[in-house]
Amino acid sequence: MTTPTPLAPDGDDPLVIAGTPLRSRLLIGTAGYPTQAIMAEAVRASGAEIATVSIRRVSLRGHGSDTVSLLAGHRFLPNTAGCETARDAVMTAELAREALGTAWIKVEVIGDRETLYPDVAETLEATRQLVDAGFVVLPYCNDDPVVCARLADLGAAAVMPMGSLIGSGMGVANPANLELICRRSPVPVIVDAGIGTASDAVIAMELGAAAVLLNTAVAKADDPVRMARAMRHAVEAGRLAHGAGRIPRRARAEPSSPQLGLVGS
């Protein structure tokens, strides 16, 4: 007997990545919080099922780290942060699979240290090699529809275009590109990087993103736990608004109340 796919809390279809249904469309990072205890509380407040973790902060002997033990029950998405070549990213992914027992990997291959822009050629090559090695690959990339299409063609389980520069808090810098990517992509689009506050997450979801991944916006907020809760509601609101359909923009007013029967008419 087939187990029914669980619906999200609002009755929406769940996010599905590589055949795995997820109730939350928010993915959250675990770096940069004031304390590990605040990190764990914020992750729980966000409602996220997936937490990203840098393999550099996880024991390779299999004993785990504070992050892993504090977030028991969550699905971990290790990343290749700090890698600058496909070779390094593949090696880091192999270490992550050994340390965490997961084939899921967020590929980050940085091409410029000042802007933290991804290296497109190396990201494509890392994705190709890791897909061939049996990984579930979620690559971080620039907001280029062609690059996202190439990554999907290579077998990426989702694509993760940047909203804006990592840690910048500038929100969605290129909504036209992002909307095009979301409309065309055959795999889920997860907006990654640049989210600064809840309204940024709403915009990303309204443009058609399947999910949002964020870290700094919560970790560096004055109250990370409260911001995590805000992000949870923002992602849900943006998803609902996208499905509901916004009214067209007009350059003129249009009354919402009927004009018939007005006094003096």
From Swiss-Prot:
| Organism encoding this protein | Methylobacterium sp. (strain 4-46)
The protein's location, in the record's own words, is: Cytoplasm
Question: Gene Ontology cellular component?
Answer: cytoplasm
Q: What Gene3D superfamilies is this protein classified in?
A: Aldolase class I (3.20.20.70)
- From the UniProt entry, list the residue stretches annotated as the region Disordered: 245-265
User: Could you tell me the keywords of this UniProt record?
Assistant: Cytoplasm, Schiff base, Thiamine biosynthesis, Transferase
| Family of this protein | Belongs to the ThiG family.
Catalysed reaction per UniProt?
Answer: [ThiS sulfur-carrier protein]-C-terminal-Gly-aminoethanethioate + 2-iminoacetate + 1-deoxy-D-xylulose 5-phosphate = [ThiS sulfur-carrier protein]-C-terminal Gly-Gly + 2-[(2R,5Z)-2-carboxy-4-methylthiazol-5(2H)-ylidene]ethyl phosphate + 2 H2O + H(+)
Pathway named in the protein's UniProt entry: Cofactor biosynthesis; thiamine diphosphate biosynthesis
**Record-annotated active site:** K106
Q: What is this protein called?
A: Thiazole synthase
As for what it does, the entry says:
Catalyzes the rearrangement of 1-deoxy-D-xylulose 5-phosphate (DXP) to produce the thiazole phosphate moiety of thiamine. Sulfur is provided by the thiocarboxylate moiety of the carrier protein ThiS. In vitro, sulfur can be provided by H(2)S.
> One Pfam family of this protein, by short name?
ThiG
**Its principal location?**
cytoplasm
Residues at which 1-deoxy-D-xylulose 5-phosphate binds: G167, A193, G194, N215, T216
EC number in record:
2.8.1.10
Gene Ontology terms, MF aspect: thiazole synthase activity
Q: Which GO terms describe its biological process?
A: thiamine diphosphate biosynthetic process
Q: How does it assemble?
A: Homotetramer. Forms heterodimers with either ThiH or ThiS.
Query: What InterPro entries does its record include?
Result: Aldolase_TIM, Thiazole_synthase_ThiG, ThiG
